[in-house]
């Protein structure tokens, strides 16, 4: 009995020492918590005793000192390592996603870097604010200066320098804007709209010239139509005037016919005399001089009669004078002028024909 008691006391002392050692080692405590709880078999293996009562007394210490508890400690450390790796991977993924733009700045070439920065900024290179509602360029067609400014904001200075030809590479932006403004002022709004729509400049010029030509042709046609209408209206107005003149001024036509007959007789008389005596040149000269004088007098008389300035002859009927009295201080009408011109032409033609007939036998 005394031997059993002494062995029990020794075991209790050992278990107390092991518990104190477990409390003294802080790194091993989380391993115990990570393993959940110690197994009774591990405690039995650590104590070297096969009895269950011994394991029940020192369940915590057995779990720490046993072989099984040692395996659980190693398993807990591996789990912690896995969790640390997961945390590192999540931290690295978040850091990669957060520093993607910074890494892209160093990895992309210069041109792609500019495009990347332009996409991730609210202000473009030329100063165009993307937060403001955009409007088409044709919206500013009434204000060409503002339209030019919007175009330069869209393009940007660096892009413009790349797009410029070699002739304008050395020009400043202000000078290029001034040149563009001068060229823009020369263009019409219609042509600017066609250029913005993508039409070729030559095609638009040809279309404008065709439009101008068609307008000119239409204007000429309208003028011709108006002239035709005016002439037709004049003719229609002249026809009743001619009838009135024929009806009301029968004495004028009679006088003209009488004068014409007298003129013809005057021309025929000297012609016959000249034909009868061709050998006498003096008579022919005198007859020609008298013919010219008679012609002038006859023309003056006919003009006065047509214009209504000559005195009415006593032989004219009174009814005619009553119906159409000779107007005084009245401008000649177009019909009267036409009649005068026709009579003078007819007499001139007759005179030329007679003169030709006189020269032939001579």
Swiss-Prot record:
The gene is CAAP1. The modification Phosphoserine is found at residues 89, 121, 204, 313. Residues 19-32, 273-282 have a biased composition (Low complexity). Residues 1-44, 65-101, 226-251, 269-291, 309-332 are annotated as: Disordered. Pfam families: CAAP1. There is a cross-link at residue 105 (Glycyl lysine isopeptide (Lys-Gly) (interchain with G-Cter in SUMO2)). InterPro entries: CAAP1 (IPR038991). Residues 282-312 form a coiled coil. Residues 33-44, 65-74 have a biased composition (Gly residues). Keywords: Apoptosis, Coiled coil, Isopeptide bond, Phosphoprotein, Ubl conjugation. Residues 1-14 have a biased composition (Basic residues). One of its GO terms (biological process) is apoptotic process. The modification Phosphothreonine is found at residue 90. This is Caspase activity and apoptosis inhibitor 1. Anti-apoptotic protein that modulates a caspase-10 dependent mitochondrial caspase-3/9 feedback amplification loop. Residues 235-251 have a biased composition (Basic and acidic residues). It comes from the Eukaryota.
């Amino acid at each position: 009995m005394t031997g059993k008691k002494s062995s029990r006391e020794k075991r209790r002392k050992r278990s107390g020492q092991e518990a104190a050692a477990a409390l003294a080692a802080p790194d091993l405590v989380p391993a115990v918590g990570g393993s959940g709880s110690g197994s009774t078999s591990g405690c039995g293996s650590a104590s070297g005793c096969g009895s269950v009562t011994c394991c029940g007394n020192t369940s915590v210490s057995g779990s720490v000192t046993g072989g099984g508890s040692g395996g659980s400690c190693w398993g807990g450390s591996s789990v912690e390592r896995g969790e640390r790796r997961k945390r590192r991977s999540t931290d690295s993924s978040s850091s990669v996603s957060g520093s993607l733009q910074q890494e892209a700045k160093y990895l992309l070439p210069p041109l792609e870097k500019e495009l990347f920065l332009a996409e991730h900024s609210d202000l473009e290179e030329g100063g165009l604010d993307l937060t403001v509602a955009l409007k088409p360029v044709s919206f500013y067609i009434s204000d060409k200066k503002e339209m030019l400014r919007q175009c330069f904001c869209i393009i940007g200075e660096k892009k413009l320098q790349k797009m410029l030809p070699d002739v304008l590479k050395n020009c400043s932006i202000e000078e290029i804007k001034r040149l563009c403004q001068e060229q823009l002022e020369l263009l019409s709004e219609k042509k600017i709209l066609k250029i913005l729509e993508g039409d070729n400049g030559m095609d638009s010029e040809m279309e404008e010239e065709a439009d101008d030509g068609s307008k000119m042709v239409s204007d000429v046609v309208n003028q011709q139509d108006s002239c035709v209408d005016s002439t037709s209206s004049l003719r229609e107005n002249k026809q009743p005037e001619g009838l009135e003149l024929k009806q009301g001024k029968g004495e004028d036509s009679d006088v003209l016919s009488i004068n014409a007959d007298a003129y013809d007789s005057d021309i025929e008389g000297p012609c016959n005399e000249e034909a009868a005596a061709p050998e006498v040149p003096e008579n022919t000269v005198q007859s020609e001089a008298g013919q010219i004088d008679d012609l002038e007098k006859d023309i003056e008389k006919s003009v006065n009669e047509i214009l209504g300035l000559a005195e009415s002859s006593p032989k004219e009927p009174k009814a005619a004078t009553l119906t159409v009295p000779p107007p005084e201080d009245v401008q000649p009408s177009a019909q009267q002028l036409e009649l005068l011109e026709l009579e003078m032409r007819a007499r001139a033609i007759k005179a030329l024909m007679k003169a030709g007939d006189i020269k032939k036998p001579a």
